[in-house]
């Protein structure tokens, strides 16, 4: 009996060792994976895109289920002008509807907009917005993206409504509020555009695109000197004159 008990204790002890060993191996593997992701991200952030691609591919060869690595691989490929491969990778992530699907929808929509594929971008954003359990910030990003696509398609009221949803979820995000002001302006409502933009005037600095949206609002209000001052920080003299003429022509069709 005593021998049987000793044998049982021995088996339990061995089992615990095996469990501890598996846990230790799992921890080491997770740490190695985390370190690999950090090194790859550092390469991406320093614009070493070929190196970053190799590192992400190596990570995925060890674990093909790493969605964050798949997302970053697509972003890395887009930066190397491997645009179709990047879009395909993002679409696959989006279709699987996993944890990285909202980010995949966001980048896929953005890349398609950058390439002038507005209808496809709108489809990507809509697919992202249909995902279950979106966080408020993810919903705001996707609503903003779909709003931009809507403006480009001439659906100003729809775009403005989407920007309102984005601002409601993230009221301190200057891009969303700047786009909301632009949406109101495209609908011809300068007063609402000014009200939407007003909170941003207290910010110490704004993204360039938001400042350019403000310059457009100033032009609509008849404040061309101030609009020129803002635009001159981003455009050459010849570009400035060309864009001022173009913007003024576009604004002639707008009314309060």
Can you name each region flagged by the protein language model?
Residues 72, 106-107, 141-145, 179, ...:
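Canonical tetratricopeptide repeat
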Residues 203-256:
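Terminal, low-structured helical/coil segments at or just beyond the last alpha-helical repeat
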């Amino acid at each position: 009996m005593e021998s049987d008990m000793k044998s049982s204790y021995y088996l339990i002890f061995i089992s615990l060792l095996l469990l501890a060993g598996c846990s230790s191996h799992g921890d080491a593997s997770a740490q190695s994976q985390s370190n690999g992701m950090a090194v790859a991200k550092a390469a991406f952030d320093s614009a070493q895109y070929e190196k970053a691609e190799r590192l992400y591919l190596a990570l995925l060869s060890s674990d093909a289920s790493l969605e964050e690595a798949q997302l970053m691989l697509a972003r890395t490929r887009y930066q190397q002008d491997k645009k179709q491969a990047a879009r395909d990778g993002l679409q696959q992530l989006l279709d699987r509807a996993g944890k990285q699907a909202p980010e995949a929808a966001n980048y896929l929509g953005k890349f398609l907009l950058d390439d002038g594929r507005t209808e496809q971008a709108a489809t990507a954003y809509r697919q992202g917005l249909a995902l279950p359990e979106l966080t408020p910030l993810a919903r705001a990003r996707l609503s903003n993206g779909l709003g931009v696509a809507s403006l480009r398609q001439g659906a100003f009221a729809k775009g403005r409504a989407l920007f309102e949803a984005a601002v409601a979820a993230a009221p301190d995000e200057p891009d969303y509020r700047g786009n909301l002001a632009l949406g109101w302006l495209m609908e011809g409502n300068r007063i609402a555009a000014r009200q939407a933009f007003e909170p941003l005037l207290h910010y110490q600095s704004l993204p360039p695109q938001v400042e350019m949206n403000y310059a457009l609002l100033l032009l609509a209000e008849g404040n061309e000197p101030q609009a020129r001052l803002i635009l001159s920080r981003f455009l050459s003299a010849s570009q400035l004159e060309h864009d001022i003429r173009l913007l003024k022509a576009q604004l002639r069709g707008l009314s309060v």
